[in-house]
Swiss-Prot record:
PROSITE patterns: PX. Residues 1-21 are annotated as: Disordered. It is found in: Cytoplasm; Golgi apparatus membrane; Prevacuolar compartment membrane. It holds the Pfam family PX. This is Sorting nexin-3. Keywords: Cytoplasm, Golgi apparatus, Lipid-binding, Membrane, Protein transport, Transport. It comes from Candida albicans (strain SC5314 / ATCC MYA-2876) (Yeast). Belongs to the sorting nexin family. A 1,2-diacyl-sn-glycero-3-phospho-(1D-myo-inositol-3-phosphate) binds at R75, S77, K101, R117.
Length: 157
């Protein structure tokens, strides 16, 4: 006499019947991932000495990066210096533009202008950090994203 029919999933499945698995348990961590966020703008100073800085949050498992997760703050002028460094560091990659400068006669510290700039800076970093040549070959990128003591004057080309 023949055996009763059993679905293949019952035959293969060795885990308990009702145990649900998370996405990471099923698929594991992606081989190389890099997540970048620019958030939490803070305006500092007073009078004509106002400036805004932005928090950069980086999560990655790429071996070239020193830390799996980092949080640092950067000013717009830091992004400008970083972009110039990238342009000098590599001629094989077109570096995207930064969001435009806000002119002094406009209210550059209102919430709308700060949010537009934050979005533009995040887009810039996502594009730059997503480029395979920069992701693994640019020490400047890693330093800018992860080193709290980053100083553009100390960069040697």
């Amino acid at each position: 006499m023949s055996k009763p029919f059993q679905p293949i999933s019952d035959v293969i499945n060795t885990s308990p019947k009702n145990k649900s698995q998370s996405f990471n348990e099923i698929y594991g961590e992606p081989e190389n991932f890099l997540e970048i966020e620019v958030k939490n703008p803070l305006t500092h100073g007073y009078g004509s000495n106002l400036f805004t800085d932005y928090e950069i949050v980086c999560r990655t498992n790429i071996p070239a990066f020193k830390k799996r997760e980092s949080r640092i703050r950067r000013r717009y002028s830091d992004f400008v210096a970083f972009r110039k460094i990238l342009e000098q560091e590599t001629t094989r990659v077109i570096i995207p533009p930064l969001p435009g400068k806000i002119f002094l006669n406009s209210n550059k510290f209102n919430d709308l202008n700060i949010e537009k700039r934050r979005q533009g800076l995040e887009k810039f970093l996502i594009v730059v950090s997503g480029h395979p040549l920069l992701q693994t070959g640019s020490k400047s990128l890693i330093e800018f994203i992860q080193n709290e003591k980053w100083d553009p004057k100390q960069i040697i080309y």
